[in-house]
Amino acid sequence: MAVTTYIVDKDGNQANAASVTKPSDRHFRGAWTLDGSVIAEDLATAKEIFKDKIREVRKPLLEAEDVVYMKALEADDATAKTNSVNKKKALRDAPAAKAITDAKTIAELKAAWDTSVLGASPYA
């Protein structure tokens, strides 16, 4: 008895995995939509997944920056406090980046990862 694997898209549609064209990676698996025998990625849903990934990555970065700020506060180091505040603002603003909003393709969305703020891209 052969086992058949089915792929289910974000809307609950399903197709035989052996008979569909799939995206090259699974980064935005939650954004997959079935269009005949092709699995496409819904860009709006992919953008939300992308923003959630940013939030996941920035959480420990914000926590670490809180420590930097507290040390600067204790040392009364105005420059370090300003730098820390600016870095935390950049981290908080990362999900609202214009490059994410303006992305028209999945490739553009992946390229919107700001390595200067968030570090290495999980999409590289």
Write out the residue ranges for each language-model feature.
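A preference for well-ordered globular domain cores
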Residues: 1-124
